[in-house]
Amino acid sequence: MATVQKIYEEMQRMAPLELAESWDNPGLLVDCGGEVSRVLVALDVTAETLAEAEQNGCQLIVTHHPVIFHPLKKLSPADLPFQLVQKGISAICMHTNLDAAEGGVNEVLAGIFGMKNWKPFAGGCGRVGEVEPITVPELARKARVELGARCNTPLDGPEVPVKYADTGKPVRRLAVISGAGGGLFEEALAMEADCLLTEIGRAHV
């Protein structure tokens, strides 16, 4: 049977920790050891995902965002790492190393949008490349459909889950970066991108 350590070693082969940004904290962050028969995969470790893992008999939670990000100065029963140990559930978190990895988050995004001849940017996390000419509104619609953004909201409804600014020019060269990429606008421009697609932008750029 698989163990926490064996699963972690396989994940490191796919997304080596050396690819992570210096400020990040990916890895096997809560190690309760032992064998693993069931795994819960989620974006974050939350009270809800922890409860779901426990209800489904999972010995391991794998997330994108680290459950321990800043150095711990104290630990209490209200803290999620404490609760994980208490319940005997380990946590592996793969963040910017998975963003930057070959076949990782941003290469998947590049594939979704049909990117060709891509190059890395944003320290290797993002991707910039050529796409078939598309308008910005069409690109926003494609993002909503392909990424399932608020899939229960009508695409032309009053609530717009994908925000965009439109220069009116077609997008032929696209930059993609998962997470908070609003600060990479100038770098995307320097790489001749017509559009930057990211999870979190900025109000003023």
Describe these PLM feature segments.
Residues 1-204:
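Hydrophobic structural segments
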